[in-house]
Amino acid sequence: MNRFLLSLLLLCISGFSFSQSNGNEWINYTQSYYKFEIYQTGIHKIDYNALNNAGIPLTTFSTKNIQLFGREKQIPIYIVDGGDQSFDNGDYLLFFAEKNDGWIDSLVYRNPTGIGNPSYSLYNDTINYF
């Protein structure tokens, strides 16, 4: 009987440990991702020259496949590509992005309203978009 209860307890504990998410469920490991650091809230423009200078192989993908992720969700983007679905000189991306603030730091506190200043992060004002 004790063996049965111990087995049942261990089974339940192991089930709870697998129910936690890693936070990287949005990643599709068959795709390439490039990191952009954002430190100001507003509309941002990334043009052909910026991507090319960063070493991103622009000839290998179509603009219809470009996605942008930040703050644990997909961000809408406006792509100006001349209608040819390729990223050429003069083409650019526009998107709205927010700087890092206290949105995720609130998870550190038992009471989320206990954060000192919700407009500023405890750790860094820069956030990465992919």
Give the ranges of each region predicted by the language model.
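Structured catalytic cores of large enzymes
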Residues: 20-40, 54-130
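Bacterial Sec-dependent N-terminal signal peptides
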Residues: 1-23
